[in-house]
From Swiss-Prot:
PANTHER family: 40S RIBOSOMAL PROTEIN S29 (PTHR12010:SF2). Binds 16S rRNA, required for the assembly of 30S particles. One of its GO terms (biological process) is cytoplasmic translation. One of its GO terms (cellular component) is cytosolic small ribosomal subunit. It comes from the Archaea. Part of the 30S ribosomal subunit. Transmembrane segments: none annotated. This is Small ribosomal subunit protein uS14B. The gene is rps14b. The keyword rRNA-binding applies. Keywords: Ribonucleoprotein, Ribosomal protein, RNA-binding, rRNA-binding. Belongs to the universal ribosomal protein uS14 family. Zinc-binding uS14 subfamily. It comes from Natronomonas pharaonis (strain ATCC 35678 / DSM 2160 / CIP 103997 / JCM 8858 / NBRC 14720 / NCIMB 2260 / Gabara).
Length: 49
């Protein structure tokens, strides 16, 4: 790790809003849960009852 390398906290932020909390990182999605709920259907995820 060099002096310019981002920390884990800086590296993992929501790609849509820039938030650091409530991230969905599975499959390298990196969206906060609110953004994921809005975009999940467009990304091909299906909601099951």
């Amino acid at each position: 790790m060099g002096a310019q390398d981002p920390t884990d906290e800086d590296r993992h932020v929501c790609r849509d809003t820039g938030r650091k909390q409530g991230l969905v990182g599975k499959y390298d999605i990196w969206l906060c849960r609110q953004s994921f709920r809005e975009m999940a259907r467009d990304m091909g995820f299906k909601k099951y009852d």
